[in-house]
Amino acid sequence: MELLIVIIVLALLFDFINGFHDAANSIATIVSTKVLTPFQAVLWAAFFNFVAFFIAKYIIGGFGIANTVSKTVVEEFITLPIILSGVIAAIAWNLITWWKGIPSSSSHTLIGGFAGAAIMASGFGAIQLNIILKIAAFIFLAPFIGMVVAFGFTILVLHICRRVQPHKAEVWFKKLQLVSSAMFSIGHGLNDSQKVMGIIAAAMIACLLYTSPSPRDISGSRMPSSA
């Protein structure tokens, strides 16, 4: 039980580090263009990250990312030391990349930490390889998808604004930056808030598996003793 508490505390620490690691992404444009002050922008982003939880629960109706994170390792191989090792690795890597200013994905770091710890403990049979390969594919696909979508939107915006006077465009774009920042923060909250839920869910599964008696133990305890 003590180890479970340690993991939950580290999971919350991971979420905190992930917050200051990624917070700048959603507020960079509204701060650099002086739409909001840095303090106002942080409050803006924090509010919409918080709102994202309720969107996931009451509108989307599920926490798919949390389930994916918790199912990275095959259930029978999930142990608290594996989860602890994965979380510590993710925290360490997030701090290193933040310190060096290197963009990185906390989701992929966390899942990689779980997978590495499980492979070290029990071999490749301990991981859900199909899930991990699907996740790894988006490390390479995401930048290209973002580039193509941004390219298309830029063409659309330039076409719409081709006859708009610059001062009018500036007024509208400042307002739209608030909308885009809010949407970015909601997306960040939908994605990243669930990772900690996945860590805690996996830890609780491991704790239950460790403390629950196996069917063999139960059947053995019920066998009458021979005289």
Task: List each language-model region with its residue ranges.
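Membrane-embedded alpha-helical segments that form the functional core of polytopic membrane enzymes
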Residues: M1-D15, L84-A90, K175-S180
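Transmembrane alpha-helical segments of multi-pass membrane transport proteins and ion-pumping complexes
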Residues: L12, F16-A23, N49-Y58, F63, ...
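Membrane-interface alpha-helices at helix entry/exit sites of multi-pass transporters
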Residues: V35-A46
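Anion-binding (especially nucleotide phosphate/pyrophosphate-binding) glycine-rich loop
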Residues: I55-Y58, G62-S104
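Cytoplasmic-side transmembrane-helix entry/capping segments in multi-pass membrane proteins
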Residues: S106-G112
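Structural signal for the N-terminal portions of transmembrane helices
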Residues: A126-F144, S212
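Membrane interface segments of multi-pass transport proteins and intramembrane proteases
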Residues: L158-W172
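Conserved small/polar residues in nucleotide/adenosyl-binding loops
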Residues: Y210-D217
